[in-house]
Regions:
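Short secondary-structure subsegments characteristic of cysteine-rich extracellular domains
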Residues: 98-113, 206-222, 337-345
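Interface/linker segment at the passenger-translocator junction
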Residues: 88-199
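Extracellular beta-strand/loop-rich repeat segments of large surface/secreted proteins
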Residues: 1-110
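Outer membrane beta-barrel transmembrane domains
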Residues: 250, 254, 339-389
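One face of beta-strands
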Residues: 67-69, 209-211, 224, 247-249, ...
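Outer membrane beta-barrel translocator domains of Type V secretion systems
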Residues: 148-308
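Solvent-exposed flexible segments
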Residues: 314, 319-325
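Outer-membrane beta-barrel and related beta-rich outer-membrane complex signature
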Residues: 238, 275-279, 326-334, 377-383
Length: 389
């Protein structure tokens, strides 16, 4: 549609006077009206058509009050249907609104008088607060106000949650090594393995590679060892990307009973770090990094039942894992202060494995099914800047 730019003409020889611009009739069909000066008044005697977009200049005064350009429509012609106006306030954002966003939007909405048309009025997201949208009915009353999550704050939360999920998955990623040692008792010593995979959390997609090394030593029915691993991941979000890293090292031990019973214990220290490049809905880029550390402990009990006269076995298992990922405080590239709560995870697992061991005990294959429950794993982040939170 066409665009109309009502222009303020100032008398350079005297004080500036913002006069009212007026039209007798406006047929608006997906057109745009740009009112570029806060306090500017535009009057339309008769409005018809399907509606369009109103970009209205607005500002927050020194006394904290909001003001915006004004549009006054005398009569709305709804013969062909009710016109709808999409009003965008420009020059302010959601950080400029008071805590009572409904009252602030009602104050702004009073500047756009178009009884007989419906309106959707929007204040764009700020550095901290999400976009605020008010629905205005045909009587000119605000019928609903909704606040959306800030796009960057939401993505930071997703990155933090993804780091936690990686942390939780590595609280006990020693099960394969422990299983190998139960299957091949003389295989203790130096070892290494590499893993590649993908994960999804809400709208975040992560591709990662893990390198894990370790060494262990058997003493009778006991086995002790140490391990270290490094995970490098690339996160893709709707409004940006992240480079995610996880480092951990740990000690592990196992008791292997002569009757097939076993107890595995793993203690680890973890460190996570993410560098991110994100974009607000207005197109502004923000970058930065977050990092934190954590500790985990897992204890697993099970028993391997060899099926007589075969190379197959069944292995019921029960495991309890506890992890604590420390709180984190950091500042984004545009000065938003983030406080991330510590996350506690208490995971219980019941499972059963069915497997096959080669007669020479040089190889094996198995399948495993488990039921898990996490009694903790709640997290939250708080954002603040210049008194806005």
């Amino acid at each position: 549609g066409a665009q109309w730019n009502p222009t303020v003409i100032e008398n350079s020889e005297g004080p500036a006077i913002v006069n009212e611009q007026a039209l007798n009739k406006l047929d608006l069909n997906d057109g745009v009206i740009n009112i570029k000066t806060a306090g500017q008044e535009v009057k339309v005697d008769n409005l018809s058509g399907t509606g369009g977009t109103i970009n209205a200049a607005a500002q927050k005064k020194e006394d904290g009050k909001l003001t915006s350009a004004k549009l006054q429509v005398g009569q709305v012609d709804s013969t062909a249907g009710t016109p709808h106006l999409a009003v965008n306030y420009q020059g302010i954002n959601a950080d400029d609104l008071d805590a009572d966003t409904a009252a602030a939007m009602t104050q702004l909405a009073s500047n756009i008088q178009a009884q007989g048309a419906t309106q959707t009025q929007t204040v764009a997201e700020g550095d901290v607060a999400g976009a605020v949208v008010a629905q205005v009915n045909e009587d000119g009353d605000v019928s609903a106000v909704t606040e959306s999550a800030n796009s960057v704050m939401g993505s930071l939360h997703q990155i933090a949650q993804n780091n936690f999920l990686v942390f939780r998955s590595q609280m006990n990623d020693m099960d394969k090594r422990m299983g190998d040692l139960r299957t091949m008792p003389h295989a203790s010593g130096m070892w290494a393995r590499a893993i590649a995979g993908q994960s999804e959390y809400k709208s975040m997609h992560n591709t990662y590679q893990t390198l894990q090394i370790g060494a262990d030593h058997r003493i009778g029915n006991f086995l002790i060892g140490a391990t270290a691993s490094y995970t490098d991941g690339d996160g893709s979000l709707k409004n940006g990307s992240s480079d995610d890293k996880n480092y951990n090292f740990g000690l592990y031990g196992s008791w292997l009973g002569d009757d097939g019973q076993f107890v595995d214990v793993t203690l680890k220290r973890h460190h996570t770090q993410s560098d991110y490049d994100l974009y607000y809905t207005r197109g502004e880029k923000v970058d930065g990094s977050m990092h934190t550390s954590g500790t985990s402990l897992s204890v697993e009990y099970g028993r391997r039942f060899n099926i007589a006269n075969t190379n197959y076995y069944l292995e019921p298992q029960a495991e309890l894992m506890y992890g604590h990922l420390d709180s984190a405080d950091y500042t984004t590239g545009n000065g938003v202060r983030i406080s991330q709560d510590a996350i506690k995870s208490l995971v219980g697992r019941l499972g059963i494995a069915a497997g096959w061991v080669s007669p020479e005990k040089t190889g094996s294959a198995y399948i495993k099914a488990s039921v898990l429950n996490d009694w903790e794993a709640e997290s939250d982040i708080r954002a603040s800047k210049d008194g806005i939170s």
